[in-house]
Amino acid sequence: MQVLKEKLLIHQQVDNWRKDGNRIAFVPTMGNLHEGHFSLVREAKRHAEKVVVSIFVNPMQFNNPQDLLLYPRTMDQDCSQLQNLGVDLVYAPTVEELYPEGSQDITFVDVPKLSTMLEGASRPGHFRGVTTVVSKLFHIVNPDVACFGEKDFQQVAIIKKMVRDLNFFIEIIQVPIVRADDGLALSSRNGYLTSEERKIAPNLYKILKKLAQELSNGNGDLEKLIAETNTELSRCRFIPDQLEICDSTTLEPFTAGTKNVVILAAAWLGKARLIDNIQTTIN
């Protein structure tokens, strides 16, 4: 497995692979890898002969400088695990490599509406940072397919729209959430939980499953269900930050005619902001 930091070398290697008739799959990450990331790699290997994984902690998508500073960097461990999975190339650029003139006054990619609603309203500028860096990585790696995790449901929708709007010839593969045995969605931020909070954290998924069942059965009015769910989260020591019920295709708010819905949730537990989602069908 190669580990490269220079975009020109990445471009050359991928070009050589493609000349030999290989398809290229790409998995962008910020490192601190876990089984959720590894599921993306395994899916990528199903779609292409060569797999590229990027490891880059992107300063543009952090609202809090302290959060950026504290984000775990585990490069040696990550590379060892990726090699065991059969990854062909790791792209690990420096900030200076991707943002040679800094990340403030630069050309950016912004997907309107989708980037400022829901999670985007809580984290202004976050998705603009995501789409800007992903578009840069797409240009450098030039993959045939790219894999993204469904845990970041809104992010996947935004990436798909960016790909359509900007005519990237890249297939976006949406990979299901990977959960611990107790139901907690795997996330790098789970490492911020204390041992006691870790025992509480699976309740987020359990409470969302209960809400999904109520919706699926057509029970109750929406405002009441959301209020009851937030109350239940608070009882479990969560601080609810976001709870939205949306059309799973458009992410528009739920209406009487909506059949396929996604419940999007974010809640603080100690220092960790946990996100999760569940899709369901209204009968």
UniProtKB/Swiss-Prot annotation:
Pathway this chain belongs to: Cofactor biosynthesis; (R)-pantothenate biosynthesis; (R)-pantothenate from (R)-pantoate and beta-alanine: step 1/1
Keywords carried by this UniProt record: ATP-binding, Ligase, Nucleotide-binding, Pantothenate biosynthesis
Pfam families registered for this protein in UniProt: Pantoate_ligase
Name of this protein: Pantoate--beta-alanine ligase
Gene name as annotated: pan6
EC category: ligase
Catalysed reaction equations from the record: (R)-pantoate + beta-alanine + ATP = (R)-pantothenate + AMP + diphosphate + H(+)
PANTHER family, alphabetized: CYTIDYLATE KINASE/PANTOATE-BETA-ALANINE LIGASE, PANTOATE--BETA-ALANINE LIGASE
Enzyme Commission number(s): 6.3.2.1
Biological process according to GO: pantothenate biosynthetic process
